[in-house]
């Protein structure tokens, strides 16, 4: 390092450090602005030191010492070569006028450079332009300087952002001439002007004189400026592309990471509840109103005791002898929600106050500081921002979590109660930072979490990440100590009914059920139909079997009379206890799974920390990846990135949905077998995925060239695991082979016609993965890569999810051996949920309450960056309220007189007050009738919901690597493509009309094959049938596609493959197999029926057959199915929908064959994909095609 004397007053500055290779050490030349071409050498000797009391030394001429004669004090420890500052500087920038790169050579000191320039041109410096003025000149004084120097023209080059210069021109002569013309009789100055222009460079507020400007070249890949040639490295090209380039620097973002485990000292309280409702006929239809709520308290013993005490204080009734189970029963419309809201608010306020008192006990100095510095008599009145300014805080942080839990409450109970309980305005001390995460999505409340936070004195930035690799964290990792109030739904973690979940996790379940139809009728009409002992009539139950079972169970209780409300309460309480047991079982089971199966014994895993099984699976995946990669930072590093902005939409365009369509409509009277791919998404996840920072444009072009060479080899298959071909996402055109080489399982689908179609038509401008390139090429398609700046190539393949899938499969196999149903359920759910987390679709919308809008959001709305798309209000009769009824009061004239009061001025028009109207009576009293007044138990901001949307359509994504989802689906298409080779390779060259029928229906992971297809599967496809052995997990040592199928239609008695002798297909997801017949034991079992959107329990094979025949024969018959549906409204701007309500609607759907088909008919029954001879009639897109 060299020490450079600063050109300004003040000593030494370290020389600029250059990251590139340094030249060999040599004696440094010294130059100044006015130096001769051959500069003198700087002396390599230490400057003489002066004693502390001596004045600064001078030269023999009496002038101060030169810049290189530097005086050092005895305490100076500076080492190195002393060099003078350079007189000139170089700047490379882009001219905004011509968009061309240029080199600007300028003088660093304006005074010396301008003086020397004027001396060379035999001009003297004006007296008022002294050295101090010139060196301190800023951009606003350039015009003044030009007028004083009387130059014909001044060019000003101003440095802008991101390496650009903006030129501007000043004409001082014209301005001077205009000023002199305005003064009559004044003679124009005849003094000579400078006969050449001046050019100035403005950097910040400094002005420099430009010595020379010339055009240069700029590398488009690394942005380096050069005159003739240059060398740029891969590292520099990558850095420029991902971090500097304004267009592409935001395309890929690093994924944030935090350990999967929670803090080991978190104290948790679980409030598990369930509600029962009845139907109330209102203005918006049949609205469901709660009349009963049962809750059970569990968790940390100390917290449970305090919660129970508070419930007793609020006069909740205990259920039976269980001191931790409480209930409320009342038919009053708003009473249940109001009481539950009061309890939740009091609970969170109590624990928040407890947390604050502990914080004050650890920081007793706060009271004195708040009084002296803030003028407050109590620290309770501090704000969070003021609390952060307090002197050094201390104390051990405390973490509290309050969970409101139920089964399927996010889609029903929380919506019904939301208008009464959705409130975060609690009586908590002022220093808390209160944040709220409320997210309604798809008819459910996905998040409704409130956090009360205080500063954490132990918080600091982590430098050693080994603890994170083990999934654990400590006090220093949390910025806040907090109380979190979270709503969690066990249905989101089990994806099944409460009874099935209890069976899956080996929990005891009481027999019997409740006649909710009778309960509903009782609360609607005041009575219900029953026998002499009050037992509900048989038609209130599902069937006679259920009626007899429940009657038998009730008679065992030996009760003289059936108490409907009491029985409903008991059933509701039992459901709550089962849910509470399920909560405990889920906590223990998942924690053990993380410790044993995942191998993270240090992690304090809490499955309820995240709301869904998908979010938990994604967290486990990231933790496993973090442990493997060891990035030593708070993100996953540069190996796995998330597409963002323009790249997010581009990658999402390559995510193509699953296959689901019949190729046969009507009745099929021949054997039919159903094959399913075993764990299709899990198997696909084990295959190689793109890894690392995407290549820069130069390296990308080289990789694209390799792909183009491979795709030009027509007839030569490409290996899916060819190491010379890098993974990527491309824009392509593709042309199919001749139609006699096509089949009914196309390799790719398209949305160009507005509907998702699996088509054999030419593809234009499709975004696909590199796996799809190989699939198309190997199926005989001619593929061309199109130039696209968003095309992405990754540097390598990596099996990123193989370990995650493998440990789940291992856990599932161990569960089967040990008959551990709980472990099997967990492994199966986690294995199936990961793909969905990768495919999560983000948008720029969010729904907030008015009181949620922080200052940043309000500023964005004011600046036009965020739009309020819609606003809805929670109706007043759905909120907690107190109503003052109509009343009258009579006043005598004396009472109405205003005594000893001053008159008040008012600009308002005289009129009646809004809450009463005067009555006209002949007596001498005045009677006022007050109308009912509703006092809302809510603030005005609590009533208003805003749907906010960013104006910028580009999505910010730093969470989900969506390219993984794209490649997972591409691998599944490769599976199906290989499956089609098994079935249809022998048909290539035969027209479609003359081919044997081998498959009639294709779903995402299944295929319905005929007898001919079954024989091919047992011969050519034998290696892909699970019962014959094979791999479900990709093996990098022996790279090949890993997927297996198994026959779903099996005999229930002997387990052999069975078939359906007769089937009917009406539409996608609308078909029926009459029965299953086993060729081995001749056993006939129940068939299979699928009717998405219909009430399947009301359908059967004969009815669907009748429906098809009626339509085929042209009969004027209508077939309908009807089912009760719950309409959930969260935040809606529709005039007929009320926010936070659940209403019953009767959904009626027409049952009929497929009308709006996305295939081309081949004959009366068979369908084939669209092709060039049978084009898609929906395609209206116009594209440019250059003919050869």
Swiss-Prot record:
Region (Disordered): 1-74
Gene Ontology CC annotation, any one: host cell nucleus
Gene3D superfamilies xref list: Helix hairpin bin (1.10.287.690), Palm domain of DNA polymerase (3.90.1600.10), TPR 1 domain of DNA polymerase (3.30.1770.10)
Cellular compartment(s): Host nucleus
One Gene Ontology MF term: 3'-5' exonuclease activity
EC primary class: transferase
Predominant place of localization: host cell
Reaction equations catalysed: DNA(n) + a 2'-deoxyribonucleoside 5'-triphosphate = DNA(n+1) + diphosphate
Superkingdom: Viruses
SMART domains associated with the record: POLBc
Keywords tagged on the record: DNA replication, DNA-binding, DNA-directed DNA polymerase, Host nucleus, Nucleotidyltransferase, Transferase, Viral DNA replication
Entry annotated with the keyword Transport: no
Bias (Low complexity) ranges: 31-41
SUPFAM superfamilies: DNA/RNA polymerases, Ribonuclease H-like
Secretion signal, residue range per the UniProt entry: none
Gene Ontology biological process terms, A to Z: DNA-templated DNA replication; viral DNA genome replication
E.C. number: 2.7.7.7
Additional note from the record: This DNA polymerase requires a protein as a primer.
Assembly mode: Heterodimer with the terminal protein; this heterodimer binds to bp 9 to 18 of the genome. Forms a complex with viral pTP, DBP and hosts NFIA and POU2F1/OCT1 for initiation of replication.
Family: Belongs to the DNA polymerase type-B family.
Known role: Eukaryotic-type DNA polymerase involved in viral genomic replication. DNA synthesis is protein primed, and acts in a strand displacement replication. Assembles in complex with viral pTP, DBP, host NFIA and host POU2F1/OCT1 on viral origin of replication. The polymerase covalently transfers dCMP onto pTP, thereby initiating complementary strand synthesis.
Stated name of the protein: DNA polymerase
């Amino acid at each position: 390092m060299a020490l450079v004397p600063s050109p300004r007053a003040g000593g030494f500055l370290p020389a600029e450090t250059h990251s590139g290779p340094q030249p060999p050490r040599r004696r440094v030349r010294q130059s100044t602005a006015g130096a001769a071409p051959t500069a003198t050498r700087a002396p390599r000797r230490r400057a003489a030191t002066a004693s502390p009391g001596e004045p600064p030394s001078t030269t023999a001429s009496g002038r101060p010492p030169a810049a290189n004669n530097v005086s050092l004090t005895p305490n100076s420890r500076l080492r190195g070569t002393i060099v003078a500052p350079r007189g000139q500087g170089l700047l490379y920038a882009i001219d905004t006028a011509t968009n061309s790169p240029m080199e600007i050579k300028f003088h660093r000191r304006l005074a010396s450079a301008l003086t020397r320039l004027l001396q060379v041109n035999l001009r003297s410096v004006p007296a008022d332009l002294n050295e101090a003025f010139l060196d301190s000149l800023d951009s606003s004084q350039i015009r003044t300087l030009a007028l004083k120097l009387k130059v014909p023209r001044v060019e000003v080059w101003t440095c802008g952002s991101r390496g650009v210069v903006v030129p501007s021109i000043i004409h001082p002569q014209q301005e001077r001439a205009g000023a002199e013309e305005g003064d009559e009789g004044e003679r124009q100055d005849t003094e000579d002007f400078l006969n050449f222009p001046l050019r100035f460079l403005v950097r910040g507020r400094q002005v420099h004189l430009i010595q020379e400007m010339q055009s240069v070249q700029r590398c488009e890949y690394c942005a380096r400026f050069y005159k003739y040639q240059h060398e740029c490295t891969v590292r520099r090209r990558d850095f420029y592309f991902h971090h500097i380039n304004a267009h592409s620097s935001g395309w890929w973002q690093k994924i944030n990471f935090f350990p999967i485990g929670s803090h080991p000292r978190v104290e948790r309280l679980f409030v598990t509840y369930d509600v029962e409702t009845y139907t109330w006929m209102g203005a918006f239809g049949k609205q469901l109103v709660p009349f009963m709520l049962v809750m059970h308290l569990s968790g940390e013993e100390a917290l449970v005791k305090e919660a129970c005490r508070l419930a007793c204080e609020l006069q909740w009734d205990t259920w039976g002898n269980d001191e931790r189970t409480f209930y409320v029963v009342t038919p009053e419309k708003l009473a249940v929600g109001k009481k539950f809201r009061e309890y939740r608010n009091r609970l969170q306020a109590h624990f928040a106050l407890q947390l604050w008192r502990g914080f004050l006990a650890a920081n007793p100095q706060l009271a004195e500081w708040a009084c002296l510095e803030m003028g407050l008599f109590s620290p309770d009145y501090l704000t969070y921002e003021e609390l952060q300014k307090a002197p050094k805080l201390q104390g051990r942080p405390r973490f509290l979590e309050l969970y409101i839990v139920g089964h399927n409450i996010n889609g029903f109970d929380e919506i019904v109660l939301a208008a009464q309980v959705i409130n975060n305005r609690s009586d908590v001390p002022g220093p808390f930072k209160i944040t709220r995460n409320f997210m309604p999505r798809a008819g459910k409340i996905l998040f409704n979490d409130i956090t009360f936070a205080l500063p954490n004195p132990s918080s600091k930035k982590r430098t050693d990440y080994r603890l994170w690799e083990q999934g654990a964290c400590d006090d220093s990792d949390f910025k806040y100590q907090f109380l979190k109030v979270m709503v969690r739904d066990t249905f989101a973690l089990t994806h099944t009914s409460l009874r099935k979940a209890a069976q899956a996790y080996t929990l005891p379940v009481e027999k019997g059920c409740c006649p909710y139809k009778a309960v509903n009728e009782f609360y609607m009409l005041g009575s219900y139909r029953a026998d002499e002992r009050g037992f509900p009539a048989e038609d209130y139950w599902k069937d006679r079997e259920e009626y007899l079972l429940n009657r038998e169970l009730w008679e065992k209780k030996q009760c003289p009379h059936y108490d409907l409300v009491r029985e409903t309460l008991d059933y509701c309480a039992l459901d709550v206890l089962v849910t509470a047991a399920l909560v405990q079982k889920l906590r223990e089971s998942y924690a053990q799974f993380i410790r044993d199966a995942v191998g993270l014994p240090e992690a304090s895993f809490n499955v309820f920390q995240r709301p869904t099984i998908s979010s938990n699976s994604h967290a486990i995946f990231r933790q496993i990846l973090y442990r493997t990669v060891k990035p030593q930072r708070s993100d996953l590093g540069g190996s796995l990135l998330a597409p963002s902005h323009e790249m997010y939409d581009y990658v999402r365009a390559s995510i193509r949905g699953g296959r689901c369509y019949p190729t046969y409509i009507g009745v099929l009277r021949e054997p039919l077998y159903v094959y399913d791919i075993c764990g299709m998404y899990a198997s696909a996840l084990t295959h190689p995925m793109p890894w690392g920072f995407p290549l820069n444009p130069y390296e990308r072009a080289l990789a694209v060239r390799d792909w183009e060479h491979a795709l030009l080899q027509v007839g030569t298959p490409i290996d899916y695991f060819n190491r010379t071909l890098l993974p990527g996402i491309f824009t392509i055109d593709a042309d199919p082979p001749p139609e006699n080489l096509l089949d009914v399982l196309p390799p790719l689908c398209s949305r160009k016609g507005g509907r998702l179609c699996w088509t054999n038509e030419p593809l234009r401008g499709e975004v696909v993965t590199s796996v799809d390139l190989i699939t198309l090429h190997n199926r005989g398609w001619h593929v061309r890569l199109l130039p696209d700046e968003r095309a992405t190539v990754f540097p390598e393949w990596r099996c990123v999810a193989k370990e995650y899938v493998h440990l789940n499969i291992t856990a599932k196999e161990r569960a089967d051996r040990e008959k551990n149903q709980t472990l099997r359920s967990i492994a199966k759910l986690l294995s199936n949920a990961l793909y969905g987390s990768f495919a999560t679709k983000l948008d720029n919308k969010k729904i907030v309450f008015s009181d949620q809008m922080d200052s940043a959001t309000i500023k964005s709305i004011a600046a036009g960056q965020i739009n309020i798309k819609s606003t809805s209000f929670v109706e007043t009769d759905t909120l907690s309220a107190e109503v003052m009824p109509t009343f009258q009061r009579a006043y005598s004239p004396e009472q109405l007189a205003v005594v000893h009061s001053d008159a008040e001025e008012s600009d308002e028009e005289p009129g009646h007050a809004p809450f009463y109207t005067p009555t006209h009576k002949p007596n001498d009293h005045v009677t006022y009738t007050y109308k009912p007044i509703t006092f809302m138990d809510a603030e005005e901001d609590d009533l208003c919901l805003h749907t906010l949307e960013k104006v910028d359509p580009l999505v910010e994504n730093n969470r989900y690597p969506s390219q993984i989802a794209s490649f997972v689906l591409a691998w599944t298409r490769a599976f199906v493509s290989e499956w089609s080779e098994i079935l249809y390779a022998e048909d290539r060259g035969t027209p479609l009309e003359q081919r044997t029928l081998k498959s009639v229906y294709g779903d995402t992971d299944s295929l319905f094959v005929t007898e001919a297809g079954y024989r091919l599967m047992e011969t050519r496809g034998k290696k892909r049938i699970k019962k014959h052995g094979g791999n479900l997990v990709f093996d990098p040592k022996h790279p090949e596609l890993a997927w297996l199928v198994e026959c779903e239609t099996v005999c229930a008695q002997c387990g052999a493959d069975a078939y359906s002798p007769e089937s009917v297909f009406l539409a996608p997801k609308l078909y029926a197999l009459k029965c299953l017949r086993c060729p081995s034991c001749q056993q006939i079992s129940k068939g299979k029926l699928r009717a998405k959107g219909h009430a399947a329990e009301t359908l059967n094979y004969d009815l669907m057959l009748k429906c098809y025949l009626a339509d085929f024969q042209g009969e004027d018959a209508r077939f309908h199915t009807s089912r009760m549906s719950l309409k959930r409204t969260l935040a809606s701007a529709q005039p007929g929908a009320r926010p936070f309500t659940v209403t019953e609607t009767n959904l009626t759907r027409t049952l009929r064959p497929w009308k709006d088909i996305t295939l081309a008919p081949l004959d009366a029954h068979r369908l084939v994909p669209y092709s060039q001879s049978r084009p898609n009639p929906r395609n209206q897109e116009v594209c440019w095609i250059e003919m050869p």
